[in-house]
Amino acid sequence: MSLVYMNIMTAFMVSLAGLLMYRSHLMSSLLCLEGMMLSLFVLATLTILNSHFTLASMMPIILLVFGACEAALGLSLLVMVSNTYGTDYVQNLNLLQC
C-alpha cells in the first residue's frame, strides 16, 4: 500500500473516530461526515486513475453529488433544529416524538 492511500485511510478513520466521539453537537457530526465523504472521494478518484478503469470514471462525481445532497439535508436539519429548540445538542432531541 502506498503512503498516499495510507494517509487517505487515516483521514477517513480520524473522521469516523470524530463522528463516534463528538456526538454532542449536530454541527460537529456534520463536519465529520463531510471529512469522511472527502476522503472517500479522493480515494475513489486515485483508485480509478491508478487502475485506468475508465468505465468507473463517473463514480467520484456521483459520490460528490451524494455528498452535496447530504450536506444540504444536514444543514437544513441543523437550521430547523436550531430554530425549534434554540440549540444544536443532539442529546436534547428525541426522535420518537412526532
From Swiss-Prot:
Q: Which biological process annotations from GO are given for this protein? A: ATP synthesis coupled electron transport
Identify the Gene3D superfamilies for this entry: 1.10.287.3510
- What are the annotated GO cellular component locations? mitochondrial inner membrane; respiratory chain complex I
EC code: 7.1.1.2
The keyword Electron transport appears for this protein:
yes
Q: Does the keyword Transport apply?
A: yes
Where in or outside the cell it occurs: the entry states: Mitochondrion inner membrane
Instruction: Give the residue spans that cross the bilayer.
Output: 1-21, 29-49, 61-81
Under the GO molecular function aspect, what terms does this record hold?
NADH dehydrogenase (ubiquinone) activity
- Disulphide bond pairs: none
In which domain of life is the source organism classified?
Answer: Eukaryota
* Function according to Swiss-Prot or TrEMBL: Core subunit of the mitochondrial membrane respiratory chain NADH dehydrogenase (Complex I) which catalyzes electron transfer from NADH through the respiratory chain, using ubiquinone as an electron acceptor. Part of the enzyme membrane arm which is embedded in the lipid bilayer and involved in proton translocation.
The similarity comment for this entry is:
Belongs to the complex I subunit 4L family.
How is this protein organized at the quaternary level? Core subunit of respiratory chain NADH dehydrogenase (Complex I) which is composed of 45 different subunits.
Please report the name of this protein according to its UniProt entry: NADH-ubiquinone oxidoreductase chain 4L
Q: Which organism is it from?
A: Muntiacus vuquangensis (Giant muntjac)
